[in-house]
């Protein structure tokens, strides 16, 4: 059997919007930065990042511009895959701005809908945006699709949250990596 489509789509968000999200991450004093978690909790062997969970109701203009851009991309995805919107979709949980130091990544193959967390069980689609360019490594590998994304500032990808899209990070040996991960869930 041959796979017909990957259901992975993408586009580019303006560099100024990425700079705004990165500035928010670096200057926000009311949201905490914590060790990145997996579905099993904090495990620095699997995921080495410093994450900031950002509620979607935050009205900071830097975040609003980013979420508006992401929602515009969702509309294009739905045009391409109309059955992806069989039910209402919404960003129900805080999204993550993540910082990986050189050599760090989320190395374990994983999906975005896993574990016993009831919130994650409603996830339908995943967004990921690279906030900075990386010269070497730092991409994302999709196991079943044999696809490796190169990290370019503003590159924003969307894909289904389930087992069909197992993926993992690739370390950037010399540079910091910043990404945003957003989950569209059944509302």
Q: What are the functions of these language-model segments?
A:
Residues 1-156, 164-187:
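Fe(II)/2-oxoglutarate oxygenase catalytic core
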């Amino acid at each position: 059997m041959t796979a017909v489509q990957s259901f992975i789509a993408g586009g580019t968000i303006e560099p100024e919007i990425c700079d705004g999200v990165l500035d928010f991450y670096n200057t926000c004093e009311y949201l905490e930065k914590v060790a990145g978690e997996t579905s099993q909790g904090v495990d620095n062997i699997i995921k080495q990042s410093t994450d900031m969970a950002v509620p979607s109701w935050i009205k900071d203009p830097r975040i609003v511009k980013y979420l508006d851009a992401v929602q515009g991309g969702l509309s294009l995805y739905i045009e391409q895959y109309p059955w992806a919107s069989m039910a209402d979709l919404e960003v129900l949980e805080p999204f993550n701005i993540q910082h990986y130091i050189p050599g760090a990544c989320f190395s374990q193959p994983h999906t975005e809908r896993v574990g016993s967390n009831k919130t994650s069980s409603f996830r339908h689609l995943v967004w990921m945006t690279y906030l900075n360019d990386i010269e070497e490594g730092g991409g994302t590998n999709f196991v079943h699709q044999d696809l490796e994304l190169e990290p370019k500032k503003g590159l924003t990808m969307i894909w289904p949250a389930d087992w069909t899209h197992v993926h993992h990070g690739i370390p950037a040996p010399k540079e910091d990596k910043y990404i945003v991960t957003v989950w569209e869930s059944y509302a």
